[in-house]
A protein has these predicted regions:
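Extracellular receptor-binding modules and their adjoining Ser/Thr/Gly/Asp/Asn-rich linkers
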Residues: 1-36, 77-163, 167-168, 195-226
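Extended intrinsically disordered, low-complexity coil regions enriched in Ser, Thr, Gly, Ala
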Residues: 34-70, 100-101, 156-182
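Charged, low-complexity intrinsically disordered segments and flexible loops
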Residues: 173-201, 208
């Protein structure tokens, strides 16, 4: 089956990239950054990302609608001080506009409605694989193509705690994170665990705990030429 006109195909709406430099040992850095995508009709897009780095993990941790924009926050963790720099590429996909006009060399229409269901000029969301599991893994795809991953389910575990610091009469809050992330080296997808620790001082006492979700699922998307 090549085309099913019962479904609305997704096509590329916007894209962008950001270079991330591995900080020096002891250098202060912010472990997250954001990018913004203009929305169509107030509906958030489907986001695929490609992190080109052997050892730097990047993954979407938060997204929010702000006006007519979809603002996405990406968490990243370098291997300090000798890790590779990283580049994050992001791709935003929306349903194809229904039209009877096609401009590509190959155009398929529903013969009853005259609506275009495929146009070779459009950059469709091309899903080539689904990677699911609960532990680190590696997958290889044909060379000469460019791939990105789209998270459908994220595996994570976060444990929080509060400790009273008597010498400063304050509480220290901490959180230990483990998140499964996807990173690319050429056409090889590496699913790896990323561990991070957050801490702050002066937060009032609260109840610590553990929150987790077991199991991940990523779509592998061919974005060659996009």
């Amino acid at each position: 089956m090549l085309v099913d006109d019962s479904y609305e195909n997704l096509t590329l709406h916007a894209k962008g990239s950001q270079f991330i430099r591995t900080p020096a040992l002891g250098e202060t850095y912010v472990p997250y950054f954001t990018f913004s995508v203009p929305m169509i009709g107030g509906v958030p897009p489907a986001i695929a990302i490609r992190c080109e780095s052997r050892d730097m993990g990047m993954h979407i941790v938060h997204s929010v609608i702000s006006g007519n924009n979809y603002v996405v926050t990406v968490l990243w963790q370098p291997n300090i001080p000798n890790g590779d720099d990283g580049i994050l590429y992001w791709y935003a996909f929306y349903p194809t506009s229904k039209t009877s006009r096609g401009t590509g060399v190959v155009v398929l229409r529903n013969r009853h409605t005259n609506i275009v269901t495929f146009d070779s000029d459009l950059k469709y969301l091309r899903v080539v694989d689904v990677i699911s599991g609960s532990s680190e893994t590696t997958a290889n795809y044909p060379a000469g193509r460019t791939y990105a991953s789209m998270a459908m389910r994220i595996q994570y575990r976060v444990q929080t705690d509060n400790v009273y610091l008597e010498h400063v009469d304050a509480w220290r809050w901490s959180a230990d994170w483990d998140i499964i992330s996807a990173r690319w080296t050429g056409s090889t997808l590496n699913i790896r665990n990323v561990s991070m620790r957050q801490a702050d001082q002066g937060i009032p006492n609260g109840v610590g705990g553990v929150w987790q979700q077991v199991g991940f699922s990523f779509l592998v998307v061919d974005v060659t030429g996009y």
